[in-house]
From Swiss-Prot:
Localization per Swiss-Prot or TrEMBL: Cell membrane
Gene Ontology biological process terms from the UniProt entry: phosphate ion transmembrane transport
Segments of skewed composition (Basic and acidic residues): 381-390
GO molecular function, one term: symporter activity
Major subcellular site: membrane
Topology class, membrane: Multi-pass membrane protein
Catalytic activity annotation: phosphate(in) + H(+)(in) = phosphate(out) + H(+)(out)
The protein's name in its UniProt record: Probable low-affinity inorganic phosphate transporter
Organism, scientific name: Mycobacterium leprae (strain TN)
Parts of the chain that traverse the membrane: 5-25, 44-64, 81-101, 108-128, 135-155, 218-238, 327-347
Entry-linked Pfam families: PHO4
GO cellular component, one term: plasma membrane
Region (Disordered) location: 377-396
């Protein structure tokens, strides 16, 4: 086996690993509000999301072409560069998942690839007009649009149903949330799976298996990416689901449906035009907007501020990881460079996973009241069994915002 074929295999495996992390990292985009409002049981929600991500991945390839052709010069691409960019995306995804921050998998991937490209040949190898016009500007516009649409939609929902009893309204909107959340999952699969398709497409063009004039990736690439993102989604990114569903605002069913519908509309529209949009930023913007649009609603601006900070540093920090990885793999060179680079990625991933087990967040405790941070007030054991000191522990620290929705009693039903 020659070194280029070996590198291609490593790149494809790493790309599918990124797609897998994208699935569990971004599950919260679609299902956090439905889980928080009690519209769907947690395990049922992630199952629906996985199926619809799988279906959505087959609906379009416009974003895949953007990733493969519109951000960096395809003639200057090497397999080392693609691998390094993927490492940047995976490491950033795992770090933000550990912290429960819903940052952009899309921007992590793009940042990693651009950083590796700069490390390889300098800034002239990057199509900056493409980065600005198809990544940065759409992200800013989409996030702001999602906030506005989410706020207006929520305000309208509450205005229209003002005279309807709350119990009746909540019941009906929970049913509606099943449809709106499903639409977001479908949109996520349509938008995000394509990004990994685009990376593998780029690698195949670099290797020479696919013509640089090809407009769509091979069918096997589409199928593998669809399966990878669906499998990751089914695991459920509980840490990020908790932040989106409980951390920023307290979600009621009318808010949830308004936020999800707003997100789906923006994401599907962007996918149609081939924009490499961050579904995370759109969904987070919609949730924030729902908090602003609800009469008497509250937003935890500290949590929102941490998210915004993560968004700002995603491109440069993921790019830095991609650049360092490229230097390591390139300087060592050959089989040793590829093996060492891949081994470092595995080691970093395992270390982050072990750290996350110290306080486990899963379907059993994802809807616990937010007490100031992701894991505050949660049981640190794997089984979440009640301890004799749980009562005093929870009462000792008064949470800043206490949930009052009536679905608390059923959140452990799954």
């Amino acid at each position: 086996m020659n070194i280029n074929l070996f590198l291609l295999i490593i790149v494809v495996i790493t790309a599918l690993a990124f797609d897998f992390t994208n699935g569990f990292h971004d599950t919260g985009n679609a299902m956090a509000t439905s889980i928080a409002s009690g519209a769907l049981a947690p395990k049922v929600a992630v199952f629906f999301s996985a199926i619809l991500n799988l279906v959505g991945a087959f609906l379009s390839t416009a974003v895949a072409a953007t990733i493969a052709k519109d951000l960096i010069e395809a003639d200057l691409v090497t397999l080392e560069l693609v691998f390094a960019g993927l490492v940047g995306g995976i490491v950033w995804n795992l770090l933000t998942w550990l912290l429960g921050i819903p940052s952009s998998s899309s921007h992590a991937l793009i940042g990693g690839i651009v950083g590796a490209r700069i490390a390889a040949v300098g800034g002239h190898g990057v199509i900056w007009s493409g980065v600005i016009s198809k990544v940065i500007i759409p992200a800013i516009i989409a996030a702001l649009l999602a906030i506005v649409v989410g706020a207006v939609a929520t305000w309208l929902v509450y205005a229209i149903t003002r005279s309807v009893p709350a119990m009746s309204t909540d019941t009906r909107f929970r049913r509606g949330q099943i449809g709106s959340a499903s639409l977001v999952s479908l949109a996520h699969g349509t938008n995000d799976a394509q990004k990994t398709m685009g990376v593998i497409f780029l690698a195949l063009m670099s290797y020479g298996t696919v013509s640089k004039t090809a407009s769509t990736p091979p069918l096997w690439v589409i199928v593998c990416c669809a399966i990878a993102i669906a499998a990751g989604t089914y695991l459920g990114g509980w840490r990020i689901i908790r932040t989106l569903g409980k951390g920023m605002v307290e979600i009621k069913p009318p808010q949830g449906m308004a936020a999800e519908s707003s997100s789906a509309a923006v994401i599907l529209l962007s996918a149609h035009f081939g924009y490499a949009l961050s579904t995370t930023q759109v969904c987070t913007g919609s949730v924030l907007g729902s908090g602003l649009g609800k009469p008497g609603g509250e937003v935890r601006w500290g949590v929102a501020g941490r998210m915004a900070t993560a968004w700002l540093v995603t491109l440069p920090l993921a790019g830095s990881v991609g650049a360092v990885t490229y230097w390591i793999v390139h300087l060592i060179g050959g089989y040793p460079g590829a093996v060492i680079g891949f081994s470092l990625l595995v080691a970093a991933s395992v270390a982050i996973y072990i750290r996350s087990r110290k306080v486990k967040v899963d379907h059993k405790n994802v809807n616990e009241n937010w007490e100031g941070s992701l894991t505050a007030g949660l049981d640190g054991s794997d089984e979440h069994k009640p301890h004799s000191d749980v009562g005093p522990k929870l009462s000792a620290t008064l949470p800043r915002y206490r949930s009052s929705h009536h679905t608390v009693g059923v959140r452990n039903a799954s």
